[in-house]
Amino acid sequence: MSNTEITAKTQADEAHSFAEYEAIATALLPYIDAAKTGDGELSRTAFYDHAHIVGSVGGEFSYPDADAFAENVSQIGASPDVKSRIAWIDISGPAAAAKVEFINWSGLRFTDFFVLYKTDGQWKISGKVYDSHSNN
């Protein structure tokens, strides 16, 4: 076997790895889509019930639970011009971390860091730390 050949095990491992990245990106979509639509209930589906959320908007520290955060998303309403990107995803077994950036979510720029965990074959957000930056 030459050094350039990929073994069947490596192919299977890499296919699984790619699938996990896609599954995590999919798990983040309800949250990302809620920024655009203002649908707090959609955002809520991305979080475990026990999820911890901490961060700041305009320098004001906040630590809402997942239900209160969903209410905030609904109150803010739709931001149809929001832009977002998943900057990175890092996975270790059933645990993962992700960074998502938003521009123009209700006129603000946000950086969100997520901790996700996979149970029963499903990835969900267990924790979120965020910060708003200066207006776009």
Stretches with model-predicted labels:
Residues A19-A23, H52-R109:
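Surface-exposed, charged secondary-structure patches
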Residues D49, P94, G121-Q122:
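Beta-strand-connecting loop/turn residues
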Residues F47, G59-E60, F114, S132:
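Sparse recognition of residues in long alpha-helices and their boundaries
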Residues F47, F102-N104, V129-Y130:
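Short beta-strand segments enriched in hydrophobic/aromatic residues
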Residues M1-E41, T45-D49, S62-P64:
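Short, low-complexity N-terminal intrinsically disordered segments enriched in polar/charged residues
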